[in-house]
Amino acid sequence: MAFLWLLSCFALLGTAFGCGVPAIQPVLSGLSRIVNGEDAVPGSWPWQVSLQDSTGFHFCGGSLISEDWVVTAAHCGVRTTHQVVAGEFDQGSDAESIQVLKIAKVFKNPKFNMFTINNDITLLKLATPARFSKTVSAVCLPQATDDFPAGTLCVTTGWGLTKHTNANTPDKLQQAALPLLSNAECKKFWGSKITDLMVCAGASGVSSCMGDSGGPLVCQKDGAWTLVGIVSWGSGTCSTSTPGVYARVTKLIPWVQQILQAN
């Protein structure tokens, strides 16, 4: 019996910090409109990190995929002099138990193209591992064969601008629920700029905006939140009637696995 009890304890530990299952449940209104966003429940997106320069200025988002690795967008231009902040909700508060983590190595996808914005992904190897807790844990990565069909309601999070005209980004982490579009549908807005290395979401009254870049677009699969997109580009005015464009993670997984295995 004691052995069974031990097993059940391990099972609980697994679900506590297993990927894609927040210890603190997110609450979505479903009408959340990050332009027209809503505050997230503190700690409910535990993989969300803030990428900051040495002055503490937030310039991009990212996602923890393990204790040692963060995924973000290549166009963010992350350097080893930048820092990763995990466990943060309110950037205006000094009362949070955040983890400020140094970056040991930056792996920018060598096929990233600044003109086409294809392959917009960078992996960051942390100098010291993040300590997983109730408010810090990993998102699940998809398999290359996973299918997330158009119409799937997903969520993007970030500290990006809530209006493109605002001078400052919000202090509190914002969230927005938004549907995936087919690439054919997305091309009606963006034409030939859309490639199979991208996935679109939104045009539904919500939008990612400047400062959200590199952050997650997550969809639920088998009860766990899975990283489907990385905030990449969109309308310069963060129009909520135009879809945002995200790096399509299923297409980039082979490269991710190659880097993780070699390092």
Swiss-Prot record:
Keyword Chaperone in record: no
Enzyme class: hydrolase
Record-level Gene Ontology MF annotations: serine-type endopeptidase activity
Alphabetic keyword roster: Digestion, Disulfide bond, Hydrolase, Phosphoprotein, Protease, Secreted, Serine protease, Signal, Zymogen
Biological process annotations from GO: digestion; proteolysis
Modified residues (Phosphoserine): 93
Catalyses which reaction(s): Preferential cleavage: Tyr-|-Xaa, Trp-|-Xaa, Phe-|-Xaa, Leu-|-Xaa
InterPro entries for this protein: Peptidase_S1_PA, Peptidase_S1_PA_chymotrypsin, Peptidase_S1A, Trypsin_dom, TRYPSIN_HIS, TRYPSIN_SER
Family to which this protein belongs: Belongs to the peptidase S1 family.
Protein name: Chymotrypsinogen 2
Lineage: Eukaryota, Metazoa, Chordata, Craniata, Vertebrata
